[in-house]
């Protein structure tokens, strides 16, 4: 039997654009939340979650076959697609939760405790393996994160503690799951992995 666990790896203090990346991601989530609140009636008519997500993405992302209704791509140029999709999912979840809470509040007849949709958020970006996060060669205590430097999305090398990397190398079974990033006050990469059966 295999157990799924996670392990937080603290990054050493480094000169990488962590704050800029966090700020642009949270701005994107706030902008999308505002858009999806405006068009919620339209989105709520789509019962299938995957189809609703696709419709939400088509509203903000222009392709050859789809001109977007809103200017997300102009406001957040070159945002990696996986990060854009994570922001869309977060915003959809926030608006959906708000709408459900509002409906329940209205049915209750209470005057106090009216739900509020927060545009300022504490969303944390997800770094998907290979497109937003990749490891250095075996034996090196480094990884690469795709971060926003204020102008463009670039790969930045992050140095990890040797003991953390040894633990991860020992316990990762080869099937690595998506790493997440950031916690208030410190920077962490939490990598979910399957613990090898002894």
What is each PLM-predicted segment?
Residues 1-198:
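Nucleic-acid substrate recognition interfaces
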């Amino acid at each position: 039997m295999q157990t799924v666990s996670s392990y937080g790896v603290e990054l050493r203090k480094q000169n990488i654009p962590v704050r800029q990346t966090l700020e642009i991601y949270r701005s994107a989530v706030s902008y999308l939340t505002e858009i999806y609140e405006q068009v919620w009636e339209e989105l709520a008519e789509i019962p299938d979650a995957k189809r609703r997500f696709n419709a939400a993405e088509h509203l903000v992302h222009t392709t050859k076959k789809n001109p977007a209704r809103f200017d997300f791509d102009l406001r957040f140029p070159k945002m990696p697609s996986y990060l854009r999709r994570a922001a869309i999912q977060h915003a959809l979840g926030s608006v959906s939760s708000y709408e459900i809470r509002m409906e329940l509040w209205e049915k209750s007849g209470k005057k106090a405790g009216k739900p509020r949709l927060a545009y300022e958020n504490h969303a944390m970006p997800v770094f998907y393996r290979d497109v937003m996060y990749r490891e250095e060669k075996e034996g090196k205590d480094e990884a690469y994160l795709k971060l926003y430097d204020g102008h463009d999305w670039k790969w930045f090398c992050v140095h990890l503690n040797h003991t953390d990397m040894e633990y991860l190398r020992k316990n990762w079974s080869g099937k690595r799951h998506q790493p997440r990033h950031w916690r208030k006050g410190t920077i962490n990469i939490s990598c979910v992995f399957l613990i090898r059966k002894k």
